[in-house]
Each structure stands twice: as C-alpha cells, then as structure tokens.
Amino acid sequence: MSSTENKNLLDPGFELTLRPMRYPDFYERYRDAIKNTWTVEEVDLHSDVADLAKLTPGEQHMIGRLVAFFATGDSIVANNLVLTLYKHINSPEARLYLSRQLFEEAVHVQFYLTLLDTYLPDPDDRAAAFAAVENIPSIREKAQFCFTWMDSVEKIEKLETAADRRRFLLNLICFAACIEGLFFYGAFAYVYWFRSRGLLHGLATGTNWVFRDETMHMNFAFEVVDTVRKEEPELFDDALQQQVTDMLKEAVEAELQFGRDLCGDGLPGMNTESMREYLQCVADQRLQRLGFPPVYGSENPFAFMELQGVQELTNFFERRPSAYQVAVEGTVDLDEDF
C-alpha cells in the first residue's frame, strides 16, 4: 500500500515505504536505540551474592518479590509488542523501532533470568518466582490490571472505527504510562534504595541499562500518542481523558499493594507511605506528559530517585559519559546528583 493511501498512523494496512519518510522521528529513535546496545554478560553479579547474605529477613523478602515481578513483567510487555503495537502502528519507521524494542525486551528477560539463577539457588524458589502471577497476590493484581486495560484490543484486526482506535490508545497508554512508566519505575526505586546503601551493585548496574531502555520505550510510545493526537484530535475527548485518569489511579493502587507486600511494616528509608508519594508523583508526570491534568500534587520523597520531575532520565543518560554504548565500556554511576 502506498503512502498516499495511508493518511494517518493508525489507518489499517501494512505501509512499506521508507522514502519519502513520513515519520523521521521514529527512525531517529531506532538509530538512538542501536547506540545503546548492552549485553547481560557486561553485568557482574558476583559481589551481590555476598550482599544477599547481609540482608535482613525483611530485605530478603523484598528482593524475592522484586525478582519474581521482574521474571514476568517484561514478558507481558513483549507479548503486547508483538500482538498489538507492531500490528496496528502502520509506519515502517515505527516498526523498525518496535523490532529493536522487542530485542531489548528479550535482553531484559535474559538479565532477569540470570538474576534469578544467581539470587535464588533453590530450583523450587525459582519455579515459584516464574509462577508469581498465579501464586503471589500482589503480582497477580498487577498482571490482572494489565490484562483488563490491554486485552480489549487483542482481537481487533483493523482499527476501522473511532471506538477501536480509542481502545488501542488505552492499550498503548497502559503499556507506556502504567507498565513501563509506573510499575517498573516503582520496582527500580527499590533497587536504587539498596544501591544508595552500597548494596547489590550488580543489580543496580543492570537496572541502570534496563531503566534507560524502558524510558526510551515509554518516550517512543508517548510520541506515537502525540502523533495520533495531531492526526486525529477528535479521539481525545473527555471520556478518554477520564479513562486514562482512572487507569493511572488504578495503577497506583495496584503498585501500592505490591509495595505493602515488599515493605511490610517498613524498612529504614523505605516504607509504604513514601512509596505512595513517589508513585503519585510519577503518575502526575505521566498524566501531564499525555496532556491531561495531574490529580495528586505529590512530590518525590526519595533523594536517591531525584529525577528532576521524574521524566528526565533519558537526558541524564545522554549527558553522562559513563553510559554504556556500543563500543564504549563503562557503567552508569548514580552516586552523583541529577
């Protein structure tokens, strides 16, 4: 199908034409992603084994829950990439990026598999972690949230109606703002809490690179939303705004339940109330990025997660010379303020 027949990004079809390029920003994002290639073999987890032995029972419980979530979270993301996003975002430039993103999600899954093998030497513990969606209520609730908001578009073959396109937008926004942009941001906060105390350096190093990748994925998805808003502004009505706001509120509550599971009665420097404020701050940032008003007005309580309004992590990685890139050795040091 030629470009002249396809007027909008979500028009059904399979656009193949890269010249003239209709969406050069998506292509540039693909090229930027290539520069940030990393491999699991670059992550040294040896020192983490000794650190694990130093943790309190409460901290060990937190780590166990984190690796259980990591074991399943990126698989949900990868499935949605293949079954929904690649299918309906009709741009060869965007599909180049999505192909690259799928590779990155596979690297993340490999990293978490290596993490599980290192952190959980008992085969039964590993099996339980991979079955977390079935046997850990707080993780099951997060998975159910994802399926509730994302599955409605799965059986749609073509986005031919406004209602179908709004359902797709809800899927994309859930994927970007809630899973990549809230659930993973919450999980990474626990990792950096350990890192701020000089613990689990290997986990923190791998998380630096995963965090950067996830932020780039989120920003790409938001750019897709921006493009659809320009091409079809009528899709962004009051009802969609309310649905997105409700979605973010539900995501905060689901992630907060996970936080209660991880934190219990609280740990020094990490407790449920602080996590609530952090998640609300992140949710407000996501709503504002989508062009909707914030609802919480909370501030980030974690000095170790001072992200200048949460949304500027990508800029941080771009300006740090130690960020890993192809043919460049080094790690990201989060000890410095940013």
List each language-model region with its residue ranges.
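Non-heme di-metal
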Residues: 1-338
